[in-house]
């Protein structure tokens, strides 16, 4: 009887009912909770911008510690302001990359598209503004924070993802990170899914699903970019 009613409901509404589990790729949080062997205790938000993702993860994982990394001072100040009411929240005013260093970041129009990638991080005009920032590696910061693991590492750094992962090679090899959620795309501005897989697969991280698929801004409706969840193979 229950199965009959389920089918009738689906026929009448055009909806699909799932009893215990959604299909992979439907909901990031659902997939992480399904795969994780323990509660999510630590989330790192790399390329935090003004706190949008930190607020989202704090709501979905209310008992976790959120660490946000944002090097640009104007974004960082708004990050602090927007997340001031969050418990267990820590903001860090530096970038994460392949080595510990200091560098200059050039501002590229909208604040969400600043990038440290060499071919993107350059002045577009004589009046292009810039800021001196610090860069640290994930391996260094994990040791500095005396943190043994990071459950979820989110990276949105406008094409600089491989460099961030390059600074986490030791931590990744030692499986100190469980989930990696990062932006991928089809044009040169984004890291390709193939390049990320080539980096992560040999050290034991495999792609699990795609999320937030976005069409090209020109309105042609072809796929432009999306987010990919990589999972350490022991959890699969």
Which role does the model predict for each range below?
Residues 1-236:
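Phosphate/nucleotide-binding beta-alpha loop and adjacent structural elements of enzyme active sites
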């Amino acid at each position: 009887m229950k199965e009959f009613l389920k089918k009738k409901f689906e026929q009448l509404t055009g909806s699909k009912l799932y009893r215990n589990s959604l299909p992979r790729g439907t909901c990031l949080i659902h997939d992480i909770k399904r795969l994780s062997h323990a509660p999510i205790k630590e989330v790192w938000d790399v390329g935090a911008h003004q706190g949008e993702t930190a607020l989202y993860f704090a709501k979905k994982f209310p008992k976790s510690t959120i660490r946000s990394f944002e090097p640009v001072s104007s974004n960082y100040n708004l990050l602090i302001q927007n997340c001031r009411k969050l418990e267990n929240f820590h903001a860090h005013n530096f970038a994460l990359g392949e080595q510990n260093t200091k560098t200059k970041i050039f501002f590229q129009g909208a604040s969400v598209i600043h990038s440290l990638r060499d071919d993107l991080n350059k002045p577009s005009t004589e009046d292009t503004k810039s800021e001196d920032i610090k860069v640290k590696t994930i391996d260094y910061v994990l040791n500095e924070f005396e943190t043994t693991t990071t459950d979820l590492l989110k990276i949105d750094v406008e094409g600089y993802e491989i460099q961030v992962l390059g600074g986490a090679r030791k931590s990744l090899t030692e499986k100190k990170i469980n989930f990696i959620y990062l932006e991928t795309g089809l044009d040169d501005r984004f890291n390709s899914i193939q390049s990320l897989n080539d980096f992560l697969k040999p050290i034991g991280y495999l792609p699990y699903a795609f999320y937030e698929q976005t069409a090209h801004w020109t309105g042609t409706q072809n796929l432009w970019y999306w987010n990919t969840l990589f999972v350490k193979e022991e959890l699969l």
